[in-house]
Regions:
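C-terminal cap/linker of serine protease catalytic domains
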Residues: 39-41, 298, 302-358, 423-424, ...
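PDZ/PDZ-like groove recognition
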Residues: 155, 335-402, 410, 415-436
């Protein structure tokens, strides 16, 4: 009898232990579910908050440049009149008769006035104040180069170029300079007008425009020093007209912090450049393009920079100014660390007259950049580009927009019309886009 009681008690104890274990397991599972539900609730609440904060942080540290409306006659000016015009660009802006009449009346009134020495001094003082204000945003960009002489002795050389402060976020101060200033280096020394020297890095280069963007991180150590740093606002180069006053700052004489004044003599629209077109301005003064010469309007806004891209053509000279309005999308991407995709062609929209004669609508290719993606894909001068990926191409604007949506390293399908013996034939090629 005692043995039966022992067996009963032993079994009962096992059942009680099993119940306790099951109860503990149930509590643990319930706690796990509660924790999971709590974590999910916290995630649902905090994720949107964190995402919002991340977006706000990104917005605070990104740069947005307001786009300028085109001149209005851009599409008609862009059309190809003949294959020879695809290189030079033929659009020339002439003032309307009414505006010209008003300008002549103003000029006549100015000529009839007798200016005193006091008037001249006052005008000179106004120009000087404007130049001094703009010069505060000019910096000297220097990078050291290590070399060796014939006896293998270490030599250090440096060259100075002009940079221009154009934007400031919570985390960095951004400058424009020339690609010559950052050749062979990713780090440069920036010297401010007040004498401070700081290290900056090359954010991006653009070989097509010879432009580079520098980034100087804003830290606790330099925040106070950079708090009042002047930056030059972007202007609208489309508004420039012949006879307008221009300020040349940076290094127009080949020396940093030099300045020149001049007047705009001529405007040429839709000049063919790689993968697009630009507006070129011809002033009555020269500047040093490689060293960095930045061009401001009378309001002290950046409207362009001196370029030597057209120095070998008859249509332009070494004093040409590249207008900023056509290039604002590219500059904005550079300042935000985004490289512009490169196809590597020069061309112009096929005009109405040519279409009536049987040429397909699209962009007539006048030249292909050697070793560019277009060259590697087999594109040739005389081809007419009609599509890039899913984008229909009829104008250079269409090509620019399609490349804006593309990225370096992306493979795109290009549809071309190539002139055969009797008619244009459709050809498809694939190009891997490079960076500019």
């Amino acid at each position: 009898m005692q043995e039966d009681e022992f067996i009963t008690q032993h079994i009962a104890e096992k059942k009680q232990k099993r119940k306790k274990l099951m109860a503990l397991a149930g509590k643990a599972a319930l706690a796990g579910v509660s924790f999971a539900l709590g974590a999910a609730a916290i995630t649902c609440v905090t994720c949107p908050i964190l995402a919002k904060k991340w977006r706000q942080s990104t917005e605070k540290n990104s740069v947005k440049i307001e786009r300028d409306e085109s001149r209005g006659e851009g599409e008609s000016r862009e059309q190809l009149s003949s294959p020879a015009e695809a290189e030079s660009g033929s659009g020339e802006v002439n003032g309307e008769a009414e505006n010209q009449n008003i300008r002549e009346q103003v000029e006549q009134a100015i000529e009839n006035r007798d200016y005193t020495l006091s008037d001249i001094r006052q005008m000179a003082g106004t120009l000087r104040k404007q130049a001094d204000s703009a010069d505060a945003a000019v910096v000297s960009v220097t990078h050291e180069q290590a070399e060796r002489d014939w006896f293998n002795n270490a030599l250090e050389s440096s060259e100075n170029y002009a940079g221009l402060a154009v934007a400031k976020t919570e985390s960095e101060l951004l400058f424009l300079t020339t690609t010559a200033a950052v050749e062979g280096t990713d780090t440069v020394t920036v010297t401010f007008a007040r004498g401070d020297r700081m290290s900056a890095t090359v954010k991006l280069r653009d070989s097509a425009t010879h432009l580079a963007v520098l980034s100087l991180p804003i830290t606790d150590a330099n925040r106070d020093s950079l708090a009042k740093q002047a930056v030059i606002p972007f202007g609208n180069s489309y508004r420039l007209k012949r006879g307008d006053l221009l300020f040349l700052i940076g290094s127009p004489l080949g020396m940093i912090h030099s300045v020149k004044y001049g007047f705009l003599s001529n405007v040429r629209t839709n000049v063919s450049v790689m993968d697009g077109y630009a507006t070129v301005y011809l002033p009555d003064v020269s500047g040093d393009a490689a060293s960095g010469t930045w061009v401001l309007n009378a309001d002290g806004e950046l409207v362009g920079w001196m370029t030597d891209l057209f120095s070998e053509t008859e249509a332009q000279s070494s004093t040409a100014i590249l207008g900023i309005s056509d290039l604002k999308p590219m500059i904005e991407r550079m300042m935000n660390g985004k490289e512009t995709a490169k196809l590597g062609i020069y061309g112009r929209q096929v005009g109405t007259t040519q279409r009536e004669q049987g040429m397909p609508a699209g962009v007539y290719i006048s030249r292909v950049e050697p070793n560019a993606p277009a060259y590697a894909a087999g594109m040739q001068p005389g081809d007419i580009l009609i599509s890039l990926g899913d984008s229909k191409i009829e104008t250079m604007r269409d090509l620019e927009a399609a490349l804006e949506k593309s990225a370096k390293g992306e493979s795109v399908r290009l549809t071309l019309m190539r002139n055969g013996r009797e008619k244009y034939e459709t050809i498809s090629v694939t190009a891997t886009l490079a960076g500019r």
